[in-house]
Amino acid sequence: MTETAVLLWVTIGIAVAFDFTNGFHDTANAIATSISTRALAPQAAVALSAAFNLIGAVVTVAFFQAKVSNTIASTLAFKAGLVVIMAALLGAICWNLITWYLGLPSSSTHALIGGLCGAGIAAAHGLDGVRWSALAKQVASLVISPPIGFAVGAAFITALLLVIHQFKFRPVRLNRTFRTLQVVTAAFVSYSHGANDAQKTMAAMTLALVAAGDLPKFQVPLWVVFLSAATIAFGTYAGGWRIIRTLGWNILKLDPATGMSAQLTGATVIQAATLVGLPVSTTHVVTGSVMGVGASRKLSAVRWGVGANIIAAWIVTIPCAAIIAWVTFAILTTAGLHG
């Protein structure tokens, strides 16, 4: 086996590890609210989320093409080598693990984009390594999606409460209905997460195959689709309980109506972004929806201090992942790896 082939499969292995941490890290997006309101038992919620992550990743790419993968691949201004991709993935993985340990719902999407930027700048020995116009488009979608989630969540719960008040539904019956609906919306969030987030790993794997000369152009192979989908589902099943605690209990005390509203509005925003090819952070969108739903009812219902810590983690993710990837690239090339 040639050195390039070895580097390729090591890079694919690292991409699989990133995909696993993505699923592991982002389990909370889909199921935290369902668990906190007792709509789903923890293990049932995790199994449901894993299954729909798998379905979302495969179905979306099969029927709507890998639009998000193409957007991610456009970050670099040059044909990336394997060491660049390896360093980018390692930077993203490190940041995912750091924020998981701290219990912060940071963004795997931000981390990967930051990793690509850091490794690209290191490889090009300057800022020319990044296609800044493409990066600006990605960052714009990442920045505006949480406020959209917040606004849509606030508007939806306000309208829902008006309907409930108008028709004077019984609280016991309502809670039972909303708990049932939360199972459906948890599946919808999971489907949307798989559809958007698995494509980021597909992009990294396909870039590696192009760099190694195994693919003539950027086109996601079928085996990459299934490997990415299965891995993110497996990572989801492993679950990230620290972050589930933050989203499900620490930001806002949820009831079935607010939990269902946050899930439904978050999933809708994510799915819309996926269909137009924009990479968004499922973590940010769902967190924005949770905060919007809570704030619309009572500003003091939201624990804004926890929200501020989460926002701080969002802001530093891209630069921190970029720095880690830059250092990793320097270490790998100093060790004699090229490609």
Regions found by a protein language model. Give the residues of each.
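Multi-pass alpha-helical transmembrane bundle typical of ion/small-solute transporters
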Residues: 1-339
